[in-house]
Curated annotation (Swiss-Prot):
The keyword DNA-binding does not apply. Keywords: Aminotransferase, Mitochondrion, Plant defense, Pyridoxal phosphate, Transferase, Transit peptide. CDD domains: OAT_like. Residues 23-43 are annotated as: Disordered. Residues 29-41 have a biased composition (Low complexity). L-ornithine binds at residues 180, 323. Its EC number is 2.6.1.13. One of its GO terms (molecular function) is ornithine aminotransferase activity. Its cofactor is pyridoxal 5'-phosphate. GO terms for biological process: arginine catabolic process to glutamate; defense response to bacterium; hyperosmotic salinity response; mitochondrion localization; ornithine catabolic process; plant-type hypersensitive response; proline biosynthetic process; response to salt stress. Belongs to the class-III pyridoxal-phosphate-dependent aminotransferase family. This is Ornithine aminotransferase, mitochondrial. It comes from Arabidopsis thaliana. It holds the Pfam family Aminotran_3.
């Protein structure tokens, strides 16, 4: 009997070993003892081969980061002037945020909203008290937060405002950027985001950003069916476009007058980026809904949130909206630490003062190169340089960013003639100065050579006319 048992065990161990399974099914990969690729060039080649081509990155590979400093695999140091589109306001790998992550990851990472966990309720209370709203609906990405706000506005419109079934309208702004999901790009004027992705979703109207008169005209004509007005207090992807003074107050008054929800997308502009906790604070207005994201996760984990009062939020019932990972304990712990850093390190004040320093430096450069620089604009550390397309062509803003990269500064273009400058709010004055000096050297030393080299090339075509509304957005 014992011999039979041993033979059976031997057969099972062989039959169901890794080698046995491989012989039977032929599906398991062979062990690879080689080290993973480490050179920047090879890593970029691998990404190009195996990843979808939905981004056009500046060719630099991040290997390590701390504060405002990035290192590539070869050890070259760079100053970060993008901060992951403002997701790293607190600085890369902030020790307090990393500690919160490490402590929580050893206890509990996910419960789903099918059950309670011991972190999200504390985070929910903290966030709502901090921003003065009754309730929060947690999600993960900024686009999810916007989608959540849109659904909530439609639901409120049908149930509270008595908009007829399936007739709720959301008004948004030309030049807006709220994400790339289907409902969101249905509002977009970005032809790259809309062409080939139809049919786009109905129920959207557009208005010029910063034009309160045009907004009131739409409200007068269709206000009985308009549920919400979605806007960025400062348009980021459009090139850090700041509305005229008084615009946000006028929007608040119009939304109240016509019973329309005022929905502020503060995913990029919020959490101290503009020199205020929220960009809406520049005009001391309170939207009906605020969407937060990016820096809410401290550059560590995706966290987004929609804030609203109960008379809006409670129109969502169980089963009508949710997310498996939204409000997870790991994200909640990280988000609370991220908020602590903003408050304790006075990042609102740092953003305001350092932003003033940066714009002084950039305007000095503008005076030296008026032929090339059309405008310097921004609030806090949310800034952009717009170049003169005629004098820059056929060189593009992307080419400027490539030259900046060679000089140790990482920035990203938006559209063909704008470079956005949004460093971590923890950046030092010396690093700001280094970044400005690098830009000066690019314009003085590199740009003349770039113009000479590219003199015979056809300028990069950048269509600025929206397919849908016909507006010339970035001319």
């Amino acid at each position: 009997m014992a011999a039979t048992t041993r033979r059976l065990l031997y057969y099972v161990s062989k039959r169901f070993s890794t080698a046995g399974v491989r012989r039977s099914y032929g599906g398991l990969p062979q062990s690879n003892s080689k080290s993973p690729p480490s050179s920047s060039q090879r890593l970029m080649e691998l990404e190009s081969e195996f990843s979808a081509h939905n981004y056009h990155p500046v060719p630099v590979v991040f290997s390590r980061a701390n504060g405002s400093t990035i290192w590539d695999p070869e050890g070259k140091r760079y100053i970060d002037f993008l901060a992951a589109y403002s997701a790293v306001n607190q600085g890369h790998c902030h020790p307090k945020i990393m500690k919160a992550l490490q402590e929580q990851v050893e206890k509990l990472t996910l419960s789903s909203r099918a059950f309670y966990n011991d972190k999200f309720p504390v985070f929910a209370e903290r966030l709502t008290n901090m921003f003065g709203y009754d309730m929060v609906l947690p999600m993960n990405t900024g686009a999810e937060g916007v989608e959540t706000a849109l659904k909530l506005a439609r639901k409120w419109g049908h149930e509270k405002k008595n908009i007829p079934k399936d007739e709720a309208i959301i008004v948004s702004c030309c030049g807006c950027f709220h994400g790339r999901t289907l409902a969101i790009v249905s509002m977009s004027c970005d032809n790259d985001a809309t062409r080939g992705f139809g049919p786009l979703l109905p129920g959207n109207l557009k208005v010029d950003f910063g034009d309160a008169d045009s907004l009131e005209k739409i409200f007068k004509e269709k206000g009985d069916r308009i549920a919400g007005f979605l806007f960025e207090p400062i348009q980021g992807e459009a090139g850090v476009i700041i509305p005229p003074d008084g615009y946000l107050k006028a929007v608040r008054e119009l939304c109240t007058k016509y019973n329309v929800l005022m929905i502020a997308d503060e995913v990029q502009s919020g959490l101290a980026r503009s020199g205020k906790m929220l960009a809406c604070d520049w005009e001391e207005i309170r939207p009906d809904m605020v969407i937060l994201g990016k820096a809410l996760g401290g550059g560590v984990i995706p966290v987004s949130a929609v804030l609203a009062d109960k008379d809006v939020m409670l129109h969502i019932k169980p089963g009508q909206h949710g997310s498996t990972f939204g409000g997870n304990p790991l994200a909640s712990a990280v988000a609370m630490a991220s908020l602590d850093v903003i408050v304790e390190e006075k990042l609102v004040e740092r953003s305001a003062s350092l932003g003033e320093e940066l714009r002084i430096q950039l305007n000095e450069i503008k005076k030296q190169f008026p032929k090339y620089i059309k405008e310097v604009r921004g609030r806090g550390l949310f800034n952009a340089i717009e170049f003169n397309s005629e004098s820059l062509s056929p060189v593009s803003a992307y080419d400027i960013c490539l030259s900046l990269k060679e000089r140790g500064v990482l920035a990203k273009p938006t559209h063909n003639t704008i470079v956005r400058l949004t460093p971590p709010l923890s950046i030092s004055s010396d690093e700001l100065r280094d970044g400005s000096e690098a830009l000066h050297d690019v314009l003085e030393l590199d740009l003349p050579n770039l113009l000479k080299i590219n003199s015979g090339k056809t300028p990069v075509s950048h269509i600025t006319e929206c397919d849908r509304c016909g507006r010339n957005l970035y001319a």
